[in-house]
Amino acid sequence: MSRIGKRIIEIPSSVQASVEGSKLLFKNGKEKHELETHNRVKITLENNQLSFQPVGEDAQSRAYWGTYGALANNIVIGLSTGFSKILEVNGVGYKVALGNKTLDLSLGFSHPVKYPIPAGIEMVVEKNTITIKGSDKQKVGQVAAEIRSFRPPEPYKGKGVKYSDEVIIRKAGKTAKK
């Protein structure tokens, strides 16, 4: 029995939800999300409460049950409060600036890295900290991972782009021979 799937999702008043066949539609004042579900999952929406039930008793139906419960919950949380990731840029001469629909990064390369900000994502830059905000959890995480991949933190001095809660395991450098 799926612990995630059997949980009932409370839909706040700021989010409107509707079911059209196997599609779930969510929207708040400015954004809209759609979730296409599999036919092995039954959707029930009553009194601003969303629940899922597996159609069969096989393992595949139970797997879809939990998956779609988690995806719908993430959409509701994203539309009501939103998701955010914080990245820190560490290193001498490493700089971050917010341009016109681009994020400009100076990460020690011979050229500046320009990252186009995708639709639905908002970025705030303070000193060497990048805050990525959005309503789509997958998109926020993907953008953060792409920015981090330009210069991941290295284990000797810790220079690079890292998540704010990431712990870098440091290595000792070479020792001199006597």
UniProtKB/Swiss-Prot annotation:
UniProt xrefs under PROSITE patterns: RIBOSOMAL_L6_1
Pfam families named among the record's database cross-references: Ribosomal_L6
Keyword Ion transport: no
InterPro entries recorded: Ribosomal_uL6-like, Ribosomal_uL6-like_a/b-dom_sf, Ribosomal_uL6_a/b-dom, Ribosomal_uL6_bac-type, Ribosomal_uL6_CS
Record has Membrane as a keyword: no
GO cellular component: cytosolic large ribosomal subunit
SUPFAM superfamilies, A to Z: Ribosomal protein L6 (SSF56053)
Alphabetically ordered keywords of this record: Ribonucleoprotein, Ribosomal protein, RNA-binding, rRNA-binding
GO MF term set: rRNA binding; structural constituent of ribosome
Gene Ontology BP annotations: cytoplasmic translation
Domain of life: Bacteria
Protein function: This protein binds to the 23S rRNA, and is important in its secondary structure. It is located near the subunit interface in the base of the L7/L12 stalk, and near the tRNA binding site of the peptidyltransferase center.
Family classification: Belongs to the universal ribosomal protein uL6 family.
HAMAP family listed in its UniProt record: Ribosomal_uL6_B
Subunit field text: Part of the 50S ribosomal subunit.
NCBIfam families found in the cross-reference section: L6_bact
Full protein name: Large ribosomal subunit protein uL6
Gene name in the database record: rplF
